[in-house]
Amino acid sequence: MASQFCLPESPCLSPLKPLKPHFGDIQEGIYVAIQRSDKRIHLAVVTEINRENYWVTVEWVEKAVKKGKKIDLETILLLNPALDSAEHPMPPPPLSPLALAPSSAIRDQRTATKWVAMIPQKNQTASGDSLDVRVPSKPCLMKQKKSPCLWEIQKLQEQREKRRRLQQEIRARRALDVNTRNPNYEIMHMIEEYRRHLDSSKISVLEPPQEHRICVCVRKRPLNQRETTLKDLDIITVPSDNVVMVHESKQKVDLTRYLQNQTFCFDHAFDDKASNELVYQFTAQPLVESIFRKGMATCFAYGQTGSGKTYTMGGDFSGTAQDCSKGIYALVAQDVFLLLRNSTYEKLDLKVYGTFFEIYGGKVYDLLNWKKKLQVLEDGNQQIQVVGLQEKEVCCVEEVLNLVEIGNSCRTSRQTPVNAHSSRSHAVFQIILKSGRIMHGKFSLVDLAGNERGADTTKASRKRQLEGAEINKSLLALKECILALGQNKPHTPFRASKLTLVLRDSFIGQNSSTCMIATISPGMTSCENTLNTLRYANRVKKLNVDVRPYHRGHYPIGHEAPRMLKSHIGNSEMSLQRDEFIKIPYVQSEEQKEIEEVETLPTLLGKDTTISGKGSSQWLENIQERAGGVHHDIDFCIARSLSILEQKIDALTEIQKKLKLLLADLHVKSKVE
């Protein structure tokens, strides 16, 4: 669009003074065409010219409001090419007609100083009554240059982006330098490469998920401040919601380091970003409703000291204080009181009681009664009773948390090299539902003490070593009870420890259900403890992520026969098979008598073979029975094994003598012939 204005020359005004050539014919008081931010073009009066910064101030009246703005010189000349001086000619762009200015603009120009177009048009009159002012159209606007202010802004932005790129490069170089200075940089690089190429879709469980009386879950905690300071590596990967992988560092004979990736599969696996609410949703929450149906539920946290057991069960720590409102204790209590108000269970008229006690050094102490020593006895109905244990009635979640805080303040704890506030006892918090004085259901929440290796306590005091031994003994007994529960064995060795004895009603009975939360540390320095925890949990669940077929052997889950015994059993059974004696290739003769003599040998030895086979079977059963117990007698096992070996050696020696005599007779007969 273009606009043409005919502005009569005012006789009362003095002639315009020429400006400097680079400003062209722009003067104060003349009308120029300007472009608004909404792309509208109209006239405005020049009120000020800044020759130092090369900008012009213009004003106009719009809807009875006086407005103004600053415009750079180049923009003014692009919109008003007629104002450019002859000394600085500009090629005129293609023009198009614009709409005429409004009448208000024409009235305003009567009081303003007139301006004259420097390029006369062909239709200009001789008397100079009117002048044609052409405003360039869109092509001129497309070539519009940026103002100095915009140039400065763009320049600052480019400098800012350049600085940011340099800072990112510096940070990347620093991170690379830190990694290369790490003594385990090579292992860290191999772990990252393995995770980068890991395809979690190919990891699957051999056995389909089924409903079990026991649920085994694993939770990984993040690296703590101590491990980060020591530049420890995260060697635990959770590629899916039920698989945990451990990247163990190994070293070859030529000192070359490599990774041994071990895979474990469980019901659920949680990474270091999982919250307590998420863990509770898949572990303890499905068991809450069972206690309203006269069930006995147990949820316990197992793992190395400092792996996050107390954090999972109790909640967040702030120094030595613990926020119990975010742990499994509080979450279970919330659901219990929520179900208690449910119309289905409200008519049962149940009351909620809470108990809290610890098991330390094989003895039971009441944490709600100033650590009073308690006795564990069995009544006439063969029910285990903790004599003297206080049961306090609770009516809301706050009262439950109050009991937990009181008990945690009295619980036995010590400082260890791994954890400054390590629990040295098994804490058992029980939520009991009663109908009158009769127990309706019970939920036992167990925070186990951290298991320890003997190699980690060589420099510890004798008292602490005894603590660790007692802890490991009770954990072993707990594993055996869980194995018996998971395999539906007729006998559960709950008497092996005070821990399992107290939790007996949770291990026996048709309504018992158990959940295990194995907590692991991700650091490379805790690799051995992490593997022990995962193996413990894997023996409880016994699920493999393997391409090998699932095999059920003669030995119980988690137990294997010694290599020497297995090789001996295999060799003896193979050598005593009847078919092996029949297939002797070199015992041949044309005489029927010799053939019959050779063929009668297995018959003569059949009884010995049968006896030996029965002895092997009995031996295996004895070994299995002894290994299945918690307190098995090693001396007795060795003596029993030696006795069976002597019997087998005698039988094999007799067979050897008969074979040698037969071979000698065959050689003599062949020489005679």
From Swiss-Prot:
What GO terms fall under cellular component here? centrosome; cytoplasm; cytosol; kinesin complex; kinetochore; microtubule; spindle
Modified residue annotations for Phosphothreonine: T125
Coiled-coil region list: 151-176, 640-666
Question: Which of the residues bear the PTM Phosphoserine?
Answer: S204
Pfam families in the record: KIF2A-like_1st, Kinesin
Q: Which Gene3D superfamilies does the entry link to?
A: Kinesin motor domain
| Subcellular location, record wording | Cytoplasm, Cytoskeleton, Microtubule organizing center, Centrosome; Cytoplasm, Cytoskeleton, Spindle; Chromosome, Centromere, Kinetochore
Question: Superkingdom of this entry's organism?
Answer: Eukaryota
Q: In what way is this protein post-translationally modified?
A: Phosphorylation at Thr-125 by PLK1 is required for activity in the correction of kinetochore-microtubules attachment errors, while phosphorylation at Ser-204 also by PLK1 is required for the kinetochore localization and activity in prometaphase.
Which parts of the sequence belong to the Kinesin motor domain? 213-543
CDD domains hit by this protein: KISc_KIF2_like
InterPro entries in the cross-refs? KIF2A-like_N, Kinesin-like_fam, Kinesin_motor_CS, Kinesin_motor_dom, Kinesin_motor_dom_sf, P-loop_NTPase
One GO molecular-function annotation for this sequence?
microtubule binding
Binding residues for ATP:
G303, Q304, T305, G306, S307, G308, K309, T310
Alphabetically list the UniProt keywords. Answer: ATP-binding, Cell cycle, Cell division, Centromere, Chromosome, Coiled coil, Cytoplasm, Cytoskeleton, Kinetochore, Microtubule, Mitosis, Motor protein, Nucleotide-binding, Phosphoprotein
Tissue spec. comment: Highest level in lung. High level in ovary, moderate levels in heart, kidney, placenta, skeletal muscle and spleen (at protein level). Pancreas and spleen express a shorter isoform (at protein level).
Output the GO biological process annotations, alphabetical, semicolon-separated: cell division; metaphase chromosome alignment; microtubule depolymerization; microtubule-based movement; regulation of chromosome segregation
- Similarity annotation: Belongs to the TRAFAC class myosin-kinesin ATPase superfamily. Kinesin family. MCAK/KIF2 subfamily.
Note in the entry: Osteosarcoma cells (U2OS) lacking KIF2B show disorganised often monopolar mitotic spindles, severely reduced velocity of chromosome movement and blocked cytokinesis. Bipolar mitotic spindles can be restored by simultaneous depletion of KIF2B, KIFC1 and NUMA1.
Q: What does this protein do?
A: Plus end-directed microtubule-dependent motor required for spindle assembly and chromosome movement. Has microtubule depolymerization activity. Plays a role in chromosome congression.
Question: Which PANTHER family does the annotation name?
Answer: KINESIN-LIKE PROTEIN, KINESIN-RELATED PROTEIN 6
Protein name per UniProt: Kinesin-like protein KIF2B
Organism expressing this protein natively = Homo sapiens (Human)
